[in-house]
Amino acid sequence: MLGKLRDLMGLTPETDIYDEEYPQGTARTLTTEPGVEPLPASPPTPTHDFDTRPSPSVATGSVPTGSTASNVIGMPNAGRWWGAVAEVLVMQPRSFSEMPEVIKALKERKSVVLNLTLMEPEQAQRSVDFVAGATFTIDGHQERIGESIFLFTPSCVQVSTQVGGVRPSATPTPTPPSAWGMDAQQHHSA
């Protein structure tokens, strides 16, 4: 009885060695070890490593995960309809170590007002660069709204400023001529 249980569970080594399946009506070669009777031929039953029943997540419109799912990544809060309440998170971090929270909020499609007045200038600059890089990767927007105060928004938020508003436009600083530009001009003139 224990042997039959092992056979059913597939714990015994296979003793049947057979060739590829042939169309019906052609002979098949079947060899077995001595003392072992071959099983009667039966049509193969399909075996699947996955469940073919529809999952509950398909009914809700979300993307299924697992080996049968496509490479599409669901957007958090993508099911929001127009006119839904958008969340704005106001943060006043004291160190750079709090910046991953800002990135997480942006990934959750929340706008973030970042007040960096409590940070050291070097850490504040590093923080702005870090969050600006993450904002760029999600096609978001950034806007300076005050001294050491910045607005970072995901791509689903449109930011507009008033023309002639409170914030003066930045004046471009003249850049020194590049050494590369001088070399290129000298080679063309020769």
Curated annotation (Swiss-Prot):
Residues 15-71, 164-190 are annotated as: Disordered. Transmembrane segments: none annotated. Residues 54-71 have a biased composition (Polar residues). It comes from the Bacteria. GO terms for biological process: division septum assembly; FtsZ-dependent cytokinesis. Keywords: Cell cycle, Cell division, Cytoplasm, Septation. It is found in: Cytoplasm. The keyword Cytoplasm applies. GO terms for cellular component: cytoplasm. The keyword 4Fe-4S does not apply. InterPro entries: Cell_div_SepF (IPR023052), Cell_div_SepF/SepF-rel (IPR007561), SepF-like_sf (IPR038594). Homodimer. Interacts with FtsZ. Cell division protein that is part of the divisome complex and is recruited early to the Z-ring. Probably stimulates Z-ring formation, perhaps through the cross-linking of FtsZ protofilaments. Its function overlaps with FtsA. Belongs to the SepF family. This is Cell division protein SepF. It comes from Thermosynechococcus vestitus (strain NIES-2133 / IAM M-273 / BP-1).
